[in-house]
Curated annotation (Swiss-Prot):
Organism: Histophilus somni (strain 129Pt)
Superkingdom of the organism of origin: Bacteria
Protein name: Chromosome partition protein MukF
Cellular compartment(s): Cytoplasm, Nucleoid
UniProt GO BP: cell division; chromosome condensation; chromosome segregation; DNA replication
Length: 440
């Protein structure tokens, strides 16, 4: 940051004596930014009161305020900006009623913060570093030639102090603006994750990737120029060693080296912090969607299916196989009665009969478990049972078995909070996720 020769008590007393105060509402800030942009478009940098009123009229329309009091509110806003030293007002007996306004350094600084500093890019950083490299190169060559104190102040100290140092401060301020932008992106991601998940995930990926790419590109630019700049500063530092009268140059070199180190170091640290945040967001999404330990999404899905006809919804499927429509629209219904007997393998078998058979099987397993203290592996039970039935009945069979398994007992791993693995139970890709039942 810029150095100051004043102490904290001196600055505090100076501020108190002049009664400095800053207070800008959203409307007043928009007015100041509009004035700054309009001022940049003028060659003389001077504005009349009528110009400011026209600008305020546009601001008032944007904020949907009353048009009847524009003149009064415009004068109040102009006077407030003058009072807070954002604008300077000039008038004389020759220009009575036609005051001239110019932005003060404070007005330029505030508007520059909101306008120019947000235009931070790798191209701008590259141009700034190129200018710095040229200035330091000329200063190092002048230092090696040597001269009296006036020569050093003019050819070495001045370029480093008023060009290189100010560009370093500009880069440092831009980094702080990017810090603020990262916080804004984090808030935006947090808001997205509380809304529509389908849109949120895609938007989060885009924001994370864009920010990571920007940080990496800017840091690569800094790293490429950092070593060269440090070597040039060391050349100048070597030239002032042993010259006590050039202490001001040596102190400036130390300050510049510290600034450059701080800029490069914080750039890398910002990347590391963002990578950690990126991983945290992805871990949160995976945990919330894939693991779902509390079965919150599963419960909501069951409720949505149950109330589908009252509240219809769309189902998004990722990498789904093509669904085959088995209906033949050209076929007509046959109203003839079916005569004869069905083959034995096609005869209807009610779920009640299946339920009784499976209950008997589970009871035999229960007796074996109680007699021999043998754990029941639910995946093996399902695999063995499903082999005895056609694929069309697998879902009902599995549902009945699982229902009985819940009544049989508990798994110690469930009590320990261990997450079970998925295991295949048929040749068509069906899987089950359950621990071995070992506590009756």
């Amino acid at each position: 940051m810029l150095e100051t020769s004043q102490t904290i008590p001196e600055l505090v007393n100076w501020t108190r004596e002049r009664e400095f105060s800053l207070s800008l509402s959203t409307e007043r800030l928009a007015f100041l930014l509009a004035i700054a942009i309009y001022n940049n478009e003028r060659l003389d940098g001077e504005m009349l009161e009528t110009d400011l009123i026209d600008i305020f009229r546009h601001i008032s329309n944007t904020f949907e305020q009353s048009a009847e009091t524009i003149s009064t509110r415009a004068n109040n806003s102009i006077n407030e900006l003058v009072k807070q030293r954002f604008l300077n007002r000039f008038s004389s007996e020759f220009t009575e009623g036609l005051s001239i306004y110019r932005l003060t350094p404070l007005g330029v600084g505030v508007s520059d913060y909101y306008i120019r500093q947000r235009e931070f890019s790798a191209l701008r950083l590259s141009v700034q570093l190129s200018i710095v490299a040229d200035e330091i190169q000329r200063a190092s060559e002048a230092a090696e030639e040597g001269g009296d104190e006036h020569y050093w102040r003019k050819n070495v100290f001045a370029p480093l102090k008023y060009s290189v140092a100010e560009i370093f401060d500009s880069i440092d301020l831009s980094q702080r603006m990017m810090d603020e932008n990262q916080q804004h992106i984090k808030e935006e991601i947090a808001e997205l994750l509380t809304k529509d998940w389908q849109t949120a995930i895609a938007s989060c990926e885009r924001l994370l990737d864009e920010t990571s790419g920007n940080l990496r590109e800017l840091q690569d630019t800094l790293n490429a120029a950092g070593d060269k700049l440090q070597s040039q500063l060391l050349r100048i530092q070597d030239c002032v060693i042993g010259h006590d009268n050039l202490y001001f140059v040596e102190q400036l070199i130390v300050d510049l080296q510290a600034k450059l180190d701080r800029i490069i170091s914080w750039g890398q640290q910002a990347i590391d912090l963002w990578i950690g945040y990126d991983r945290h967001v992805h871990k949160f999404i995976r945990t919330a969607i894939d693991l779902d330990k509390n079965r919150v999404f599963s419960q909501r899905l069951r409720q949505s299916i149950h109330h589908y006809f009252d509240h219809p919804w769309f189902l998004w499927i990722a990498q789904a196989e093509r669904l085959i429509d088995l209906r033949e629209e050209e076929l007509t219904l046959r109203e003839e009665e079916a005569l004869g007997e069905l083959p034995e393998e096609l005869q209807y078998e009610s779920l009640a009969d299946l339920h009784e058979q499976i209950v008997e099987t589970m009871q035999s397993l229960l007796i074996e478990y109680r007699l021999q203290n043998t754990p029941i592996d639910l995946s093996e039970v399902l695999t063995a049972q499903l082999k005895q039935y056609p694929l069309a009945k697998h879902f009902d069979i599995a549902r009945i078995i699982i229902d009985q398994a819940v009544r049989l007992g508990l798994a110690q791993d469930d009590l320990n909070g261990i997450y079970p693995n998925w295991r295949s139970i048929n040749e068509n890709g069906a899987e089950v996720q359950a621990h071995v039942i070992d506590k009756y």
